[in-house]
Amino acid sequence: GTGNISSGLIESSKEPINLNADSNEWFKLNPDQTGFYRVNYQPNDLSKLEEAIQDGDLNGKDRLGLQGDAYALCRAGYSSVSSFLSLSRAYSKETEAPVLSELASGLRGIENLIEGSEFHNRYIEFCRSIFKNIAENSGWDKKESEGHLQALLRSTALSNLGHYGDEDTLHQASAKFSL
């Protein structure tokens, strides 16, 4: 999106920033991910960004950066895993392969930590819900004018659905590839 752009020097590792923003509107720090820093949003602000992702208001660089920051911050203990997972839900209509690939990597990282726990089955269902719509929109077969990134988007969605045990995907793959 477009909006007000401000710049300043952050002189410490933790420095609050006062924004003159409408409290009902979303804002994105580090637009296009040009800075080498992570942004840890307050829960209310992250919720507004989730809506912006779902509404298609953020470009691919910003969608990639948001989920990358959220995952890195939860891994480092600066934010909760539930914060990253809540943001992840907003990517169920993702259209760009690099964004989906990075998200899939983060989701797999969390799965590795909870595998065998009482939460694992619900987590698998949650992950399937993210990839299902993307796979349905991408289909199984290459389209005539499709580029390599669209093929990568499709393969990322389908392979993750297979990994997370989606029955429809497993049956289709079995029939398609005579397994």
List each model region and its residues.
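Non-catalytic accessory/interaction domains
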Residues: 1-179
